[in-house]
Design a protein with these regions (language model features):
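Class I Rossmann-like S-adenosyl-L-methionine
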Residues: 1-94
Length: 94
């Protein structure tokens, strides 16, 4: 798995299951084979997406009729993608 996949799995668990981000992040990073740079990116994506969730939802709702009708997994992908585009300036292309 790459850093974005790891981050998305963590975000899904936190937002859908109510898991604690720090515990899930620690476990997933320890279980992964990511290098330090990718671990740092995954950490930033998780904490940043969760921290900016309300702002990201406002941005998404400008383009979607009813955000509550979206599947959770799709919504979290959009949140993470928009977080990267709006708040990170040195993220490598996928």
């Amino acid at each position: 798995m790459n850093s974005r996949e790891v981050a998305l799995n963590i975000i899904n668990r936190v937002l859908e299951e109510g898991a604690y981000s720090n515990l899930v992040l620690s476990k997933e990073l320890n279980d992964s084979d990511l290098n330090e740079k990718d671990r740092a990116l995954a950490t930033e994506l998780v904490y940043g997406t969760i921290r900016r969730k309300k702002t990201l939802d406002i941005i998404i709702s400008n383009y979607v009729k009813d955000i509550s009708l979206m599947e959770d997994g799709v919504l979290n992908i959009l949140r993470m993608a928009i977080y990267q585009m709006h708040f990170l300036d040195k993220v490598p292309d996928f």
